[in-house]
């Protein structure tokens, strides 16, 4: 029994649309990675600030143990 090779590439091109033309530049850098750390330190700082924000919200809502030494006087 012989092996049959089937070409599964599409025979027709996709339909061109206005939205596709608008979104195409957003995908032009696909697969490219900038060398170095990039914005990783900035992301770390933002995550730390968000964690502090969550702890403050938790303290105000639940009188958390995390900030037990900090007095809140309203």
Curated annotation (Swiss-Prot):
PTM annotation (Phosphothreonine): residues: 3
Membrane topology: Single-pass membrane protein
InterPro entries in the record: PSII_PsbH (IPR001056), PSII_PsbH_sf (IPR036863)
Entry's Gene Ontology cellular component terms: chloroplast thylakoid membrane; photosystem II
Disulphide-bonded residues: none
Keyword Cell cycle listed: no
Coiled-coil regions listed in the entry: none
GO molecular function: phosphate ion binding
TM region positions: 41-61
Function: One of the components of the core complex of photosystem II (PSII), required for its stability and/or assembly. PSII is a light-driven water:plastoquinone oxidoreductase that uses light energy to abstract electrons from H(2)O, generating O(2) and a proton gradient subsequently used for ATP formation. It consists of a core antenna complex that captures photons, and an electron transfer chain that converts photonic excitation into a charge separation.
Subunit annotation: PSII is composed of 1 copy each of membrane proteins PsbA, PsbB, PsbC, PsbD, PsbE, PsbF, PsbH, PsbI, PsbJ, PsbK, PsbL, PsbM, PsbT, PsbX, PsbY, PsbZ, Psb30/Ycf12, at least 3 peripheral proteins of the oxygen-evolving complex and a large number of cofactors. It forms dimeric complexes.
Protein name: Photosystem II reaction center protein H
Gene source species: Marchantia polymorpha
